[in-house]
Amino acid sequence: MTQRIASHSRKTAETDISATVNLDGSGTSAIETGVVFLDHMLTNFSRHSGIDVQLRCSGDLEVDDHHTVEDVALVLGKAIVDALGDKKGIGRYGWAIIPMDEALAQCSIDLGGRSYCVFRAEFQRPVIQGLSTEMVEHFFVSLSRTMNANLHLAVLEGRNTHHMIEALFKSLAYAMKQAVKVESTEIKSTKGAI
């Protein structure tokens, strides 16, 4: 099987980001975004999806975290879709419901080339370790856009904002693990392409 590894970078007046992913990795990561809680979430995503992620970002955090969070998602999504190649044989779909103490989150994903994100969650804390909680939804919307994926994410239960967000990222990780797994030699679409 061809190695499913890809890199992508993006440099603007607001951010300078580079990312490399290995879809058939072991969940190792080296992530440095300047946003401590985002680093923690992406490390969890890597570990639980089994996707190796190397990502470095220098952003205009003196303004706020918006550009960094959005652009990190855009670059990560592009690296993942590039690593998928023609998507031949992948599971395409994945889903997970993940608990973290009192929090319960779910994610369903379709890597079929149709970008759409539905997000349902409300957080009580406005910021956690540099990450504006309003940016959590924007992260997933931006990721789905460049990954050409249909994402449905929801927090079903929860009070602790940290637990709720971490359960969301872990549910994405386990859904991705299923969706990127090579299961056959066929393309899972009646169109013959995804």
Swiss-Prot record:
Catalytic activity: D-erythro-1-(imidazol-4-yl)glycerol 3-phosphate = 3-(imidazol-4-yl)-2-oxopropyl phosphate + H2O
One Gene Ontology MF term: imidazoleglycerol-phosphate dehydratase activity
InterPro entries listed in its UniProt record: IGPD_sf, ImidazoleglycerolP_deHydtase, ImidazoleglycerP_deHydtase_CS, Ribosomal_Su5_D2-typ_SF
GO cellular component: cytoplasm
Principal place of residence: cytoplasm
Coiled coil: none
Lineage: Bacteria, Pseudomonadati, Chlorobiota, Chlorobiia, Chlorobiales
Assigned protein family: Belongs to the imidazoleglycerol-phosphate dehydratase family.
Pathway entry: Amino-acid biosynthesis; L-histidine biosynthesis; L-histidine from 5-phospho-alpha-D-ribose 1-diphosphate: step 6/9
GO terms (BP aspect): L-histidine biosynthetic process
Location in or out of the cell: Cytoplasm
EC number(s) reported in the record: 4.2.1.19
The entry's keywords: Amino-acid biosynthesis, Cytoplasm, Histidine biosynthesis, Lyase
The name this protein goes by in its record: Imidazoleglycerol-phosphate dehydratase
UniProt enzyme class: lyase
Lineage: superkingdom: Bacteria
Gene3D superfamilies the UniProt entry points to: Imidazole glycerol phosphate dehydratase, domain 1 (3.30.230.40)
NCBIfam families: PRK00951.2-1, PRK00951.2-4
